[in-house]
UniProtKB/Swiss-Prot annotation:
<feature type="binding site" description="axial binding residue">
    <location>
        <position position="37"/>
    </location>
    <ligand>
        <name>heme</name>
    </ligand>
</feature>
<keyword id="KW-0813">Transport</keyword>
<dbReference type="GO" id="GO:0009055">
    <property type="term" value="F:electron transfer activity"/>
</dbReference>
<dbReference type="GO" id="GO:0005783">
    <property type="term" value="C:endoplasmic reticulum"/>
</dbReference>
<dbReference type="GO" id="GO:0016126">
    <property type="term" value="P:sterol biosynthetic process"/>
</dbReference>
<keyword id="KW-0256">Endoplasmic reticulum</keyword>
<keyword id="KW-0249">Electron transport</keyword>
<comment type="similarity">
    <text>Belongs to the cytochrome b5 family.</text>
</comment>
<dbReference type="GO" id="GO:0005789">
    <property type="term" value="C:endoplasmic reticulum membrane"/>
</dbReference>
<keyword id="KW-0479">Metal-binding</keyword>
<keyword id="KW-0812">Transmembrane</keyword>
<dbReference type="InterPro" id="IPR001199">
    <property type="entry name" value="Cyt_B5-like_heme/steroid-bd"/>
</dbReference>
<keyword id="KW-0472">Membrane</keyword>
<dbReference type="GO" id="GO:0046872">
    <property type="term" value="F:metal ion binding"/>
</dbReference>
<protein>
    <recommendedName>
        <fullName>Cytochrome b5</fullName>
    </recommendedName>
</protein>
<comment type="function">
    <text>Membrane bound hemoprotein which function as an electron carrier for several membrane bound oxygenases. It plays a role in fatty-acid desaturation and is also involved in several steps of the sterol biosynthesis pathway, particularly in the 4-demethylation of the 4,4'-dimethyl zymosterol.</text>
</comment>
<dbReference type="GO" id="GO:0020037">
    <property type="term" value="F:heme binding"/>
</dbReference>
């Protein structure tokens, strides 16, 4: 018998290190997956702690994504529990990581251009 979580319990798991979503009344712990999400972590972070069914279906995920999702399943949502609003998680930490990556990419690109110009 799967564990059953209230909407409140799921809503409490919307932080960067402890991150759950609901899809088709099933609860998934995507904490370890969000950084690997092909669409970027910002997309999935906007849905933390809440029902992501509509967004998930609208995107049209692959069979591989559906298989991966099965491995992240931790239980079902109690549909009789009261729905709650979820406070959005700040993605400033993620944005600063992204801008650091951009700096590295630009530095490598500049080195490549300098190397090309010096060896002409």
């Amino acid at each position: 018998m799967p564990k059953v979580y209230s909407y409140q319990e799921v809503a409490e798991h919307n932080g960067p290190e402890n991150f759950w979503i609901i899809i088709d009344d099933k609860v998934y712990d995507v904490s370890q997956f969000k950084d690997e999400h092909p669409g970027g972590d910002e997309i999935i972070m906007d849905l933390g702690g809440q029902d992501a069914t509509e967004s998930f279906v609208d995107i049209g995920h692959s069979d591989e994504a559906l298989r991966l999702l099965k491995g992240l399943y931790i239980g079902d949502v109690d549909k009789t529990s009261e729905r709650v609003s979820v406070e959005k998680v700040s993605t400033s930490e993620n944005q600063s990581k992204g801008s650091g990556t951009l700096v590295v990419i630009l530095a490598i690109l500049m080195l490549g251009v300098a190397y090309y110009l010096l060896n002409e």
